[in-house]
């Protein structure tokens, strides 16, 4: 199927409306799992972005050494310290037992140090069994996990290097070739893929969408973590990984453009987080 570029009208449909009489928790509960001794900021970016995307509650699971800094970053995050400094099987099992009732979506991998890949499988399988919609990024993008997420309404968000590690194939340089490869692999593995790049390619194997919103300043570290948080926040309310990923890519790009307009080539990922309310407000709908 031919790929097509998304626009504002698509995003307006993909971002769910909110009931005027809704209560806390009914607009999405998100779990963010990430971080390490070196990369403490990644899950913070994702968590703040998820909150700014419009969900109600964000639970942020980080290594216990990172917990104080994560709590200090925002009083809005509910921080869950992991039992170990890296994701071990024991830490994964304990976290699975702490998952709050009614969790809608989870994003895993941003800056995450994984001691053993079987630990990732333990956590992912537990979440899938609870009907939690899952988005995987960065450290969680390993081939061993593909069998566990196939046909489970899951999203992966690799850049080109992570894409090769995950699928064993390098995406072509031309957009037509990239779109064709992403669509084929999404269909083959029963997942939704968001291949990040100057033009993002999003496919669930049936539909393939493109996003060209963004700015040169977005090469700064952390913008991919922001994208993961937005995707998880929307996925908590929209059960379609394709629509959630496409909307997130577009909105992330809009925030990057707005940040560059304000700060030139001197932005940070937190600038994108702070601009999310203004770029998302036009897509707000109340029922």
Swiss-Prot record:
Enzyme kind, highest EC tier: lyase
The molecular function terms in GO held by this entry are:
ADP-dependent NAD(P)H-hydrate dehydratase activity; ATP binding
Positions annotated to bind AMP: 196-200, 224
Q: Which domain of life is it from?
A: Archaea
Query: GO annotations under biological process?
Result: metabolite repair; nicotinamide nucleotide metabolic process
> Where, by residue number, does (6S)-NADPHX bind?
42, 159, 225
Q: Which SUPFAM superfamilies match?
A: Ribokinase-like (SSF53613)
Q: What is its EC number?
A: 4.2.1.136
Name the InterPro entries for this protein.
CARKD, Ribokinase-like
Location of the YjeF C-terminal domain:
7-283
Q: Which cofactor does it need?
A: Mg(2+)
Q: Does the keyword RNA-binding apply?
A: no
The reaction(s) catalysed by this protein are:
(6S)-NADHX + ADP = AMP + phosphate + NADH + H(+); (6S)-NADPHX + ADP = AMP + phosphate + NADPH + H(+)
| UniProt KW keywords | ATP-binding, Lyase, NAD, NADP, Nucleotide-binding
Please state which protein family the record places this protein in: Belongs to the NnrD/CARKD family.
Q: What task does this protein carry out?
A: Catalyzes the dehydration of the S-form of NAD(P)HX at the expense of ADP, which is converted to AMP. Together with NAD(P)HX epimerase, which catalyzes the epimerization of the S- and R-forms, the enzyme allows the repair of both epimers of NAD(P)HX, a damaged form of NAD(P)H that is a result of enzymatic or heat-dependent hydration.
Q: How does it assemble?
A: Homotetramer.
Q: What's the name of the protein?
A: ADP-dependent (S)-NAD(P)H-hydrate dehydratase
Q: Which gene holds the coding sequence for this protein?
A: nnrD
